[in-house]
Structure formats: C-alpha cells, structure tokens
Amino acid sequence: MSRRLPSTPPVLSGFTFVRVLGSGGFGDVFLYEQQLPRRNVAIKVLLPEVVNPRVRDMFQSEAQLMSQLSTHPSILSVFEAGVSSDGRPYLVTEVCVGGYGERFRAETIPVAEALRTGIRIAAALETAHRANVLHRDIKPGNILVTAYGHPVLSDFGIASSVYLGDNSTAVGLSVPWSAPEVIRESTTGSTASEIWSLGATVYSLLAGRSPFEVPGKDNSPGHLAGRILKSKPQPIGRSDVPARLEEVLNKAMSKNPIDRPHSALEFARQLQQVETSLGLPQTDRKSTRLNSSHANVSR
C-alpha cells in the first residue's frame, strides 16, 4: 500500500511553514518557524477527515496532559495548542532530531544508552503516574530524541486520567509492546501494564526486535498476541548484555502484574543498579526528578 501524501500545512498566525516532518494515521507533523520568540517548532495537525467531536476531545486532552507534564525533562515540551482557520486542531511542540521508532531495528544500541533511556523514560512515567495519568502506548516509536540528545516521551494521544478513564472503552494499542492483561482486554491500562511496556521497550532497544518476535516465524499481531499471553520473551542474544539486565527486564514483563516492579521508580532503580554493576555512571536522579514518594495510581 502506498503512503498517503501529507495534508496541506495550515496557515497559522505567527508561524511560517518550513517543511513536512512526518505523517501518521491521524495527522501530520510539520516544521514551522515561530516568529516570536524566533525558533523552530514542530506542529502536529490532525487530518480533516478524522476530526469529529470525540477525536477533537481526545486531541484537546492530549494537549492539556502534555502541557501539564512537559515541564519534566523527559517529556516532550508543549508550547501551545489551538484550532486552525480550517478547523483542524494543532499542537506546537519542541523539535526533535530523531527517535527510536526505526533506529532500534537499524542499529545496535549500546547497553549504556538503553539503560539511560529506560531510566529517563521511567522517570517521565513516574511523574505521569503521580499525576494520575497513564500513557497507554509506550513503545520505541514514542520515544524521541531532542537536539541535546535527551530522550523524551511523546504522544499522549490515547492517554487518560486514571480516575476519569473509562475501563470499558477500548483504546488503540501497539501489540508488540502491550501487556498480557491489555491483550486480553482485562484492562485498558494500569501502572503495572505501563511497566510491562517500558520493560518491553528497553528490551527492544537492546535486541533490535520486540520481545516476542521470532526471526523467521509469523510475527503478525495475532501471533505476537498469542506469544505474549503464553510464552516467555526470546533471549536478547547479545554477549554484552549482562544476565542481571535480562532478569530485570523479564521481571518487568512478568505475566502476573503483581510480580512486576510496583512503580516506574522501582524499575528505574533496578536499571540504575545494573549501571552500577557495569561500572557505568549512574543516571542522575536530579535530572530525571525521581524521589521516593508515590502517587496512589491504579495497578
């Protein structure tokens, strides 16, 4: 199937269109130059054909959530949001220079980098969870890299408040990084399922594939879902990945949510311990804003 052409970039007061950055199923991302302050920004714009009251509400929810959380250094910074003159909602964010969506399959990512990224994204999740917010779509493709080389969590498009969320409402999911209970539709998400997804994401950065992909086998969503429910993750298969790190990731991907780390903070600390055991500098907790307090978030 051929990819669709990007939509027409909207005319926005105070912004000058530069070029297309990317396209997705629901919208496009464009590079604009903002006039005041003068800087380049990324503007995510919904496609006109998908805009309806429900989608508009979800998009506004994403804007609100990200504006509240984006003061965290590992969450994509949001500058403003609005509706264009032709009725398309848009979100203005910082520009990122890369991400892990394609890179994890194309390159061998160093262990130290995978650990740093896992710790920083765990810190972002901890902040979201304390605000009673679940992301619901943690995967390599939703981790971007800023111009300063820092990983940031993006795309809270299907996130929701834990207390306001409706567990009976189905949401989109990325099967390779979805926890067993989400696959079974026992829940649309929880702190425990987010830890599973983050463990699966760190695994993917190291292995170059998602945890239940089997080289040479049928890795369609249906077969992956079956393995997620019944099988153990494939070994990472790298001699430079210590056994302790595989143990930490397998624990995070336990079938039973109770057996996983009890918070993103606990998972981050386990990754930090692996850093220490490898003689690596421990990722600075101050830069990730981790501490020992916990929000009362549903598991």
Features from the language model and the residues they span:
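AlphaC helix of the eukaryotic protein kinase fold
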Residues: L47-L69
